[in-house]
């Protein structure tokens, strides 16, 4: 059973080999696979890194009483030589950046900084790139703390967009592997912004006529490339969200955002296990989830400028249940944690939900990310079952409910008492009759109206933006104008409708209407009429 529901082999293709090693180490103590097979898998991951001693140790575990391959010793010699070579290349760079006066003199403009460093310290871009290579070599050796530091300083100085993006991934992996969860979370947000910025480039490139004559595009500037990188980011984010104190809430907020939810449904639907688990774990401690929506003006889910949709835990469960129902053709029966929610809220089958809860507890105990939350997850599942059961019954048999919760009679009675007390439910417990009497409650009318109309504002804004974009197709220049300096639509702006804009960004048409009234009350000469005719045509639009 455990082998059937284990996701390790599914997750590994989306992880760096260094991130995959902890997952295999966790499997070694789970009893799902033999230790020899796990050691062989660990060796296959480690042998192409510069962790020569660790790879040799794994080889001895995987292939006992066999001589070590000759390439391991050769790999050791190459690693020592490369370390000396790269170390000498970065000596001058490290000497410069460790000078406090240099750090205080650096500006926001990287090109200006590079020119200043070259003039004053004879520091070239090639020497700065050596810092990148040395950082990745340290990462390959398993020195993750040093790698994080070197890649950070490289990113501060470098003007190379490709290497800068690569350094983001390297620093994120390094921070994860040393357990710096605050830094890793900050790096995750930065990398997410970089991917969203790339999405704007993709939108602009698709809006422009093709000039590549069939040549291949940069992988970062294709929809397929962005989809692949977002899938990687979702998998890497699991390490952070299940270790950071507030990670479960943030996992729900990120994974339920439209861009990443589409990624999950398209390429990695197995991550729904962790969405469901995070939602169940956080629903009683979170009043509202702040889910970012795509920013209509730029057609991307920008972290800094996105619209935020507030979801209550109840609404979040409804949304994820709808997604599970739509994906049931390929996920039904593949994951007990997901099936638990499906049986409970789609099929309303309490007996089947009880069976899935038993399986879910076993799966969570073996899962790398959920093992530490097994007891909390089972408790959250029991709360969900009891809430659903009591919602449709006015009189609940305690013995029957305890059975559905997989508890003994004594533990079940204590659990029900604590639940009624903690949730402040309007209920009366009669132990003589063995019943719980529920007093039905209904939400206020105004709360129901708010829930029904919550998304109207965003949908109206998106519709208006779509109409405006249809009339004024985006160009490469105005798509990248994220600083609010877009002149399209301003008075005299290219392709605009005329009229001044007020501080809220809306077109002020009163000025145009006053001009029309003034012109109607005056008799203009033929020459004046010819001059005013274009302005009237613009204002009329």
Swiss-Prot record:
Protein's UniProt name: Eukaryotic translation initiation factor 3 subunit E
Question: Disordered: where is this region?
Answer: 466-541
What this protein is reported to do is described as: Component of the eukaryotic translation initiation factor 3 (eIF-3) complex, which is involved in protein synthesis of a specialized repertoire of mRNAs and, together with other initiation factors, stimulates binding of mRNA and methionyl-tRNAi to the 40S ribosome. The eIF-3 complex specifically targets and initiates translation of a subset of mRNAs involved in cell proliferation.
Q: Which PROSITE patterns does its entry note?
A: PCI
> Low complexity bias located where?
523-541
PANTHER family attached to this UniProt entry: EUKARYOTIC TRANSLATION INITIATION FACTOR 3 SUBUNIT E
Q: Where is the composition biased (Basic and acidic residues)?
A: 506-522
Record the organism. Mycosarcoma maydis (Corn smut fungus)
């Amino acid at each position: 059973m455990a082998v059937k529901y284990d996701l390790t082999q599914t997750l590994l293709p989306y992880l760096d080999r260094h991130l995959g090693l902890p997952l295999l180490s966790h499997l070694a103590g789970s009893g799902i696979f033999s230790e020899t097979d796990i050691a062989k898998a660990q060796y296959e991951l480690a042998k192409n890194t510069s962790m020569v001693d660790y790879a040799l140790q794994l080889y001895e575990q995987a292939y006992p009483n066999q001589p070590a391959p000759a390439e391991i010793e050769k790999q050791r010699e190459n690693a020592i030589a490369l370390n000396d070579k790269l170390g000498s290349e970065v000596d001058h760079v490290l000497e410069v950046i460790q000078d406090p006066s240099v750090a205080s003199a650096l500006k926001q403009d990287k090109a200006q900084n590079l020119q200043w460093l070259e003039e004053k310290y004879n520091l070239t871009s090639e020497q700065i790139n050596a810092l990148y290579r040395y950082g990745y070599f340290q990462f390959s050796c398993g020195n993750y703390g040093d790698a994080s530091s070197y890649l950070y300083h490289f990113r501060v100085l470098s003007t190379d967009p490709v290497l800068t993006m690569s350094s983001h991934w390297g620093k994120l992996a390094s921070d994860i592997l040393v357990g710096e969860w605050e830094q890793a979370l900050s790096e995750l947000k930065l990398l997410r912004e970089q991917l969203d910025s790339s999405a704007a480039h993709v939108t602009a490139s698709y809006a422009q006529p093709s000039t590549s004559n069939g040549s291949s595009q940069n992988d970062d500037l294709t929809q397929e490339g962005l989809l692949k990188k977002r899938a990687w980011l979702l998998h890497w984010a699991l390490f952070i969200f299940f270790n950071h104190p507030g990670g479960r809430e943030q996992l729900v907020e990120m994974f339920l955002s439209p861009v990443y939810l589409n990624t999950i449904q398209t390429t990695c639907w197995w991550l729904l296990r962790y969405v469901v688990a995070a939602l169940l774990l956080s629903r009683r401690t979170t009043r509202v989830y702040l889910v970012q929506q795509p920013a209509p003006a730029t057609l991307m889910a920008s972290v800094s400028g996105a619209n935020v949709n507030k979801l209550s835990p109840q609404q979040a469960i409804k949304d994820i249940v709808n997604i599970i129902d739509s994906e049931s053709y390929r996920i039904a029966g593949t994951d007990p944690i997901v099936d638990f929610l499906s049986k409970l809220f789609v099929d309303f089958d309490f007996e089947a939900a009880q069976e899935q809860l038993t399986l879910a507890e076993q799966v969570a105990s073996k899962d790398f990310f959920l093992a530490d939350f097994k007891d909390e997850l089972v408790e959250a599942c029991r709360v969900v079952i009891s809430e659903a059961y009591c919602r449709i019954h006015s009189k609940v048999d305690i013995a029957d409910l305890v059975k559905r919760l997989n508890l003994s009679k004594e533990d079940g009675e204590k659990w029900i008492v604590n639940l009624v007390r903690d949730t402040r439910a309007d209920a009366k417990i009669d132990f003589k009759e063995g019943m719980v009497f529920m007093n039905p409650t209904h939400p206020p009318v105004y709360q129901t109206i708010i829930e029904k109309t919550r998304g109207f504002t965003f949908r109206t804004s998106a519709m208006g933006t779509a109409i405006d974009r249809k009339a004024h197709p985006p160009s490469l220049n105005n798509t990248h104008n994220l600083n609010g300096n877009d002149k399209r639509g301003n008075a005299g702006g290219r392709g605009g409708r005329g009229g001044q804009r007020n501080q809220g960004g809306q077109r002020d048409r009163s000025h145009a209407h006053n001009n029309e009234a003034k012109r109607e009350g005056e008799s203009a000469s033929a020459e004046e009429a010819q001059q005013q005719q274009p302005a009237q045509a613009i204002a009329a639009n």
